[in-house]
């Protein structure tokens, strides 16, 4: 088992290649809807169709992006067993714009949520493997 952190541009083929062979994938991406900037949304791949999930446009500033990658991976039987998306509502998708204060704050919160999710995933893997964490013996 290994864990990788990957930063990508949202291009569908690169996304699919990045999660190839993975059982569990956690993604943070920008989204666009009528919600206020900085709103955090949670989706599972089975709730995503096309470029949208629950009426929220995935991949905020990408022409083609995460939603299309998930659809393509599903069609090619390359979708990981578990794929979760944390979508952060963007404020401005123009080139060269930095993050607004609400979006930057949401990024910090979403990162903390992903770390918690990773910790839970690792604990679940350890318990499923039957390996218990034991303190090192002292001499």
Question: Where are each of the predicted segments found?
Answer:
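N-terminal catalytic or cofactor-binding beta/alpha core of small enzyme domains
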Residues: 1-88, 97-109, 113-139
């Amino acid at each position: 088992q290994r864990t990788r952190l990957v930063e990508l541009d949202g291009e569908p083929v690169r996304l699919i290649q990045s999660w190839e062979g993975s059982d569990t994938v956690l993604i943070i991406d920008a989204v666009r809807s009528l919600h206020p900037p900085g709103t955090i949304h949670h989706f599972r791949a089975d709730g995503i169709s096309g470029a949208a999930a629950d009426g929220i446009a995935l991949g905020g500033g990408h022409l083609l992006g995460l939603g299309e990658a998930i659809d393509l991976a599903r069609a090619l039987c390359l979708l990981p067993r578990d794929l979760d998306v944390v979508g952060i509502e963007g404020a401005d998708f123009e080139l060269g714009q930095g993050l607004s204060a609400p979006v930057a704050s949401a990024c910090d919160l979403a990162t903390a949520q992903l770390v918690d999710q990773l910790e839970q995933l690792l604990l679940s893997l350890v318990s499923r493997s039957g390996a218990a964490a034991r303190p090192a013996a002292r001499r």
